[in-house]
Amino acid sequence: MTVEVEAVTMAKEEQPEEEEVIEKLVEKITGLAAAIGKLPSLSPSPEVNALFTELVMTCIPPSSVDVEQLGAEAQDMRGRLIRLCADAEGHLEAHYSDVLAAHDNPLDHLALFPYFNNYIQLAQLEYALLARHLPAAPPPSRLAFLGSGPLPLSSLVLAARHLPAASFHNYDICADANRRASRLVRADRDLSARMAFHTSDVAHVTTDLAAYDVVFLAALVGMAAEEKARMVEHLGKHMAPGAALVVRSAHGARGFLYPVVDPEEIRRGGFDVLAVHHPEGEVINSVIIARKPPVAAPALEGGDAHAHGHGAVVSRPCQRCEMEARAHQKMEDMSAMEKLPSS
C-alpha cells in the first residue's frame, strides 16, 4: 500500500515537471518560427541554414509533447512553421538539384546534399518494414512516389540500393521540379530507363494508380489533416487490391516539422494498417505501412473465404525493424557502391 502511494506521489510530482519541459520546448520553437518567418528569403544561406539546423536539433530528441493537443495559438504557429519548412525544403532541394546537374554524372555526387545520409537510412527502414510486414509478397516491380520534388532521393536510393529491377513513377504537381529531377538520371542508362516523371495533381490520377505494387505518399503532400485524409481516401478508391501504401508522418516534437498522420485516417481511407514506426535517430519521419485489402477469394465448398478486415494491429516502434534495416544496409551496400556512390 505504501509503495502504491509513493508511486502516485512521484507521478504527480513528475507531471508538472514534464509540463514545464513541454512549455519551454514550445516557447523555443515559437521563437525560432518567428525568426524564420522574418527571413527575406528561404533560399539556402548561412542564416537560413543556421536557423533550420537549430530548429531540427530542437525537434529531434524524443519528446512526450502531443502536438495535436496544443492550444489554438500554438497550433496556428505550428501550421505556419510546417509551411515554412516545406518552402525551405523545396528551395534546398532545387538548389542542390542544380548543383548536381552541373556534373557529368550527377548520381556520383549525391553525397553533396547535406541530408543524403538521412535518405539512405529512411529508404532502408521503409524497405525493411515492407519486407517484414509483407513477407509473402513478391518484390514490387512498379512503385509510385507521390510528391517526389526536384531531388527525388527516396526513389533514387530505393531503385539503386534495394529494388534494382523495379520501375519508379515519380509524381509532382510542379513541372519545374520534374524537369530538374529528370536531369539527374539522364546520364545513368539503368536508372533513366526505370525512372518516369509525371507532372500531375495526384487527386486527378485514377486508373494509373491501380498499376503500382507500392505507393509512397510524401510527408508534405496534403499538409492539412483534412487534405491528407482526402488524399488517402482517393488512393483507397483507385489503388489495386493488395497494393501497399507507405505514408510518412511525424511523432512528438517532430510534428512541428512535418504533418502528423493519424493511423485511423488510413483505416478510414480503406486500408489495413500493418505497422507504425517512430524512429528515434537522425531519421525525422515516422513511417506507416498499410495495405489495401486483397479481393476476397471465392468461398470453397463447405467453407468460408478468408478476407482482410480493417482492424489490423498497429505495431509499436521496435528495435527489430532498425536491426533488420541495418542488416539490409550492410548486405546491400557492397553491391550498391558501383551504382550509387555515397562519397
Curated annotation (Swiss-Prot):
Its EC number is 2.5.1.43. GO terms for biological process: nicotianamine biosynthetic process. Gene3D superfamilies: Vaccinia Virus protein VP39. InterPro entries: Nicotian_synth, SAM-dependent_MTases_sf. GO terms for molecular function: nicotianamine synthase activity. It catalyses: 3 S-adenosyl-L-methionine = nicotianamine + 3 S-methyl-5'-thioadenosine + 3 H(+). SUPFAM superfamilies: S-adenosyl-L-methionine-dependent methyltransferases (SSF53335). Expressed in leaves. Synthesizes nicotianamine, a polyamine that is the first intermediate in the synthesis of the phytosiderophores of the mugineic acid type found in gramineae which serve as a sensor for the physiological iron status within the plant, and/or might be involved in the transport of iron. This is Nicotianamine synthase 3.
